[in-house]
Amino acid sequence: MDFPGSEPTVGLEWEVALIDPETLDLVPRAGELLDLMDEVYPGHRVTREFMANTVEMVTTVHGNIPAAVEDLREQLLQLLDCADRIGVLLFSAGTHPFTNWGDQEMSDKKSYQEIIERTQYWGRQMIIWGIHVHVGVGSKEKVWPIINAVMTHYPHVLAMSASSPAWEGLDTGYASNRTLLYQQLPTAGIPYQFASWDEWEEFNRDQDRSGVINHTGSMHFDVRPSKYGTIEVRFADSTMAIWEVAAISAYLHCLVVYFERMYDAGEELPSLQQWHVAENKWRAARYGLKALIITDRETTERMVTDELRRWVEELSPLAEELGCKAELQDVLRLIETGGDYARQRAAARAAGAALEPGVRTRGDAGAEEGFTQPRAWRAAVELTARTLRETARD
């Protein structure tokens, strides 16, 4: 794998879904929407995705977060315009809270069909949406020390973005059920702690010889190097507001640059034992912003919100230099909201759900237990779609 290296530029990818305005369920109309986008906004950068209910906004390379977010905003406004014209709504979260995954249609792209053929049941359940953040790194020798350092902040980023508490009408008890779903795929999940670029290349040769890459196109680790000379962070849930995307992206931009400068200064970069990384991932997926996380190799524990506040302060001078101080400060605003997963639960609760983790909620009065599209979770979908639209210009 070539890694050309680059300046600390940024690029963002944001997956969103299409829903019916009446049923609020997912609809497989991405092809129709993109055909209209081609007609109305020729040259747009919105792309097809794994499922026929999904589109992805992809920015060009930018020097700072505000420029990248404005690029996303332009695409979001174009999508909202075309979605209105064909009569669908946009929805942005880690998962849809009540849809039946078995009813969803896949895109007809050959590589996607091959993935489904290989992964079967679990692959068909990938009704999930995320945010991917690319940050440029100067050389391949720096990549894995920086990735291993970024993994110490896995729970920080996941807790901020967590927005998938429900699945098929079930309150899972998790802040990010998307995280638990995605790791079922054989090439997804926490990357191995490679000590060098040579180890990474040896690993890829093994995957190529064994046919793994032939089936999947690439490894889908939660964080990975990309052919563009960037580190790609892939594990954040999609959020309901663009300012949240900006806050999470600013945090990651600052973090990668912070660790690259440590490397350049000859300082030892932080890392955690693989088992601590896995535990932190689970804790953030389960508890979101209420997670108690492991912060060092001595197994010190702190609340993730306390750690986020500490790191916002630590990164603020760098954020000012990188032009994203306001976006980084919005991490504190995000903490105050309680997280998208909590807002979805609150909306469902206000609509009358009996939200006991692991117990299916009721729909209309008299509906039997186990009804998979409860009226209560419709309120969470309405909140998410409304917030996405209302904050698109913020």
From Swiss-Prot:
Catalyzed reactions per annotation: L-cysteine + L-glutamate + ATP = gamma-L-glutamyl-L-cysteine + ADP + phosphate + H(+)
Gene Ontology annotations of biological process type: modified amino acid biosynthetic process
Keyword Nucleotide-binding in record: yes
Keywords, sorted A to Z: ATP-binding, Ligase, Nucleotide-binding
EC number(s) given by UniProt: 6.3.2.2
Keyword ATP-binding assigned: yes
Residue pairs linked by disulfide bridges in the UniProt entry: none
Gene3D superfamilies: 3.30.590.20
Its biological purpose: ATP-dependent carboxylate-amine ligase which exhibits weak glutamate--cysteine ligase activity.
Protein name per Swiss-Prot or TrEMBL: Putative glutamate--cysteine ligase 2
Species of the source: Corynebacterium urealyticum (strain ATCC 43042 / DSM 7109)
